[in-house]
Amino acid sequence: MHNPFSLYGKTILITGASSGIGRAIAIACSQMKANVIITARNQQRLQETFELLEGEGNIQIIADLSDINQLSDLVKKLPKLDGVASNAGIVRTLITQVSEANDVSEIFKINTFAPIHLIQFLLQNKKLNKNASIVFLSSISGVYCGAIGGSLYGSSKAALDGFSKALALEVASRGIRVNTVNPGMVNTGIFDRTSISQDQLEEDLKNYPLKRYGKTSDIAYAVIYLLSDVAEWITGTSLLIDGGFTLK
């Protein structure tokens, strides 16, 4: 039976694949029959992801993408790609007044500069096939709303969204598509590692019309959609996946 979302025969790079959304994307891509290349900094957790992948021909490469030399070496090792899911990033809640220069540098280095340099190197080394698809994992903080403590994180994602739209124009003549996926709150297990009470969670959930937080699979399947040929006429867009949060 024909599956319009199939990634059969496509080679897809997923960054930040050692846990959470990145792991879910990698698994989903392998289930859609892609040849998956995963990368992250943590060797043990990346191996755990690798063991969950389906199919043959998958590859794992340890690399810290915030290190420009490691990033360059990674790109040189890669075959031609049909898709990129750029997921590596960090979340930091910091009030601007008490933040330091190093905080700004680290957040932008990982959330903004690393994905930009990745695509820069892929293009310069001719690693993207014609009609390839690039998907950046951004956030609703990048396109919609501010939050106390979110000035640095939100602006790092807003910069990525701006880059994505301009890049989409630059590479359109080659049929390469560029989009972002912008999730709201996704339960990646982080609530199990915090002191947030059940009452606090229930109060926060009132901000979501669909009455739940996102699942990693919600985001992974959206990325599959944008990587697949189904979305071949979609570029330069930001896909908000937030349970209706931004409607309020």
Model-derived regions: residue spans:
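Substrate-binding pocket helix/loop in short-chain dehydrogenase/reductase
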Residues: 95-108, 204
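Short C-terminal tail/terminal secondary-structure segment
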Residues: 2-3, 224, 235-248
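Alpha-helical segment proximal to the catalytic Tyr-Lys
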Residues: 124, 165, 169-170, 232
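Short, small/polar-rich loop/turn modules that mediate ligand/substrate recognition or access, typified
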Residues: 172, 177, 234-236
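Conserved glycine-rich cofactor-binding loop
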Residues: 18-19
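Active-site helix of classical SDR
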Residues: 119, 156, 164
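Residue(s) in the substrate-gating loop at a strand-loop-helix junction
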Residues: 139
